[in-house]
């Protein structure tokens, strides 16, 4: 997998915006990606130094369409801690 296949999209929410004060950024990542692969992908794409990666699997939510019930897909979330002084400019306008 290359770096752009591992990192699916950044997550910009109120909670994640508060984490940015502590140099932590959140991303939706490929479900099969490991912490080492996520670290290398972030360092390659954004040219920053990653000190820690925390991952979690998020279960899909129950959704209804008329009388039919289904679930949204499960996905994986990664919270990446950057080295002191490094920033990701993509999040700064949020």
Swiss-Prot record:
One of the GO BP terms on file: translation
InterPro entries: Nucleotide-bd_a/b_plait_sf (IPR012677), Ribosomal_uL23-like (IPR013025), Ribosomal_uL23/eL15/eS24_sf (IPR012678), Ribosomal_uL23_CS (IPR001014)
Taxonomic superkingdom: Bacteria
Pfam families assigned: Ribosomal_L23
GO molecular function, a single term: rRNA binding
Keyword vocabulary terms for this entry: Ribonucleoprotein, Ribosomal protein, RNA-binding, rRNA-binding
Keyword Cytoplasm (UniProt): no
TM spans (from-to): none
GO cellular component terms listed in the entry, alphabetical order: ribonucleoprotein complex; ribosome
NCBIfam families for this protein: PRK05738.1-3 (NF004359), PRK05738.2-4 (NF004363), PRK05738.3-2 (NF004366)
Assembly description: Part of the 50S ribosomal subunit. Contacts protein L29, and trigger factor when it is bound to the ribosome.
UniProt record similarity statement: Belongs to the universal ribosomal protein uL23 family.
Function (record text): One of the early assembly proteins it binds 23S rRNA. One of the proteins that surrounds the polypeptide exit tunnel on the outside of the ribosome. Forms the main docking site for trigger factor binding to the ribosome.
Name of the protein in question: Large ribosomal subunit protein uL23
Lineage, broadest ranks: Bacteria, Bacillati, Chloroflexota, Chloroflexia, Chloroflexales
């Amino acid at each position: 997998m290359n770096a752009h296949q591992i990192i699916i999209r950044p997550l910009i929410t109120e909670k994640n915006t508060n984490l940015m004060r502590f140099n932590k950024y959140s991303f939706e990542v490929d479900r099969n990606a490991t912490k080492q692969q996520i670290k290398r992908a972030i360092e390659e794409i954004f040219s920053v130094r990653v000190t820690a990666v925390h991952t979690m699997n998020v279960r899909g939510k129950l959704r209804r369409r008329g009388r039919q019930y289904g679930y949204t897909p499960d996905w994986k979330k990664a919270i990446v801690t950057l080295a002191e002084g490094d920033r990701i400019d993509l999040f700064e306008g949020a």
